[in-house]
C-alpha cells in the first residue's frame, strides 16, 4: 500500500513539475533565435508544431497537420478543408521557388502566403496558433 501511495505521489509531482520546467514552442524559439537569426523563429515554431521538419520540407503530412490545427482551433471552417489544403500546397511550392532552396526564409514566405486574409484570416490564424502553441510543452532552450 505504501508503495502505491509513493508511486501516485511521484507521478503527481512529475505531472505538476513537468510543465513548470517546460516551455511552449513560441517562447523557446524566440529565446533560441531572436538575437542570432530572427528569420528562423517561424521555422523553429513550425517544426515543433509538425508543420515542417528539420530539413525545411513541407509535405502533405505537414499540410494536413496545419489544416487540422486551423480547423480544430476555428481559424477556418471545416467545410473548407480541401480549399485550405490546396492553398497551403500552393504556398509550399511558391515558397520554395521564391527562396531558391530550403532555408528559414522559406518558412517565412510560406507563412506570409498562407495567412492571406482571404481564406485564412490573420486574427483567426493568430488565435488558433496561440491556442495550439499553449497546448504544447517543449524542453526549454538552454543555449
Swiss-Prot record:
Salivary gland. Gene3D superfamilies: Pheromone/general odorant binding protein domain (1.10.238.20). Keywords: Blood coagulation cascade inhibiting toxin, Hemostasis impairing toxin, Secreted, Signal, Toxin. Interacts with human F12 (inactive). Residues 1-22 form the signal peptide. GO terms for molecular function: odorant binding; toxin activity. This is Ayaconin. It is found in: Secreted. InterPro entries: PBP_GOBP_sf. GO terms for cellular component: extracellular region. Its main location: secreted. It comes from Lutzomyia ayacuchensis. Inhibits the intrinsic blood coagulation pathway in the host by blocking activation of host coagulation factor XII (F12). One of its GO terms (biological process) is suppression of blood coagulation in another organism.
Amino acid at each position: 500500500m505504501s508503495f502505491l501511495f509513493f508511486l501516485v505521489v511521484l507521478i503527481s509531482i512529475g505531472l505538476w513539475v513537468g510543465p513548470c520546467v517546460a516551455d511552449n514552442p513560441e517562447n523557446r524559439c524566440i529565446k533560441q533565435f531572436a538575437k542570432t537569426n530572427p528569420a528562423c523563429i517561424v521555422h523553429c515554431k513550425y517544426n515543433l508544431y509538425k508543420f515542417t521538419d528539420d530539413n525545411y520540407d513541407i509535405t502533405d503530412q505537414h499540410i494536413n497537420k496545419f489544416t487540422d490545427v486551423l480547423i480544430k482551433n476555428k481559424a477556418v471552417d471545416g467545410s473548407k478543408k480541401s480549399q485550405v489544403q490546396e492553398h497551403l500546397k500552393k504556398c509550399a511550392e511558391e515558397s520554395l521557388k521564391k527562396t531558391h532552396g530550403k532555408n528559414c526564409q522559406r518558412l517565412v514566405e510560406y507563412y506570409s502566403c498562407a495567412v492571406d486574409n482571404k481564406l485564412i484570416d490573420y486574427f483567426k490564424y493568430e488565435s488558433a496558433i496561440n491556442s495550439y502553441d499553449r497546448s504544447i510543452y517543449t524542453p526549454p532552450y538552454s543555449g
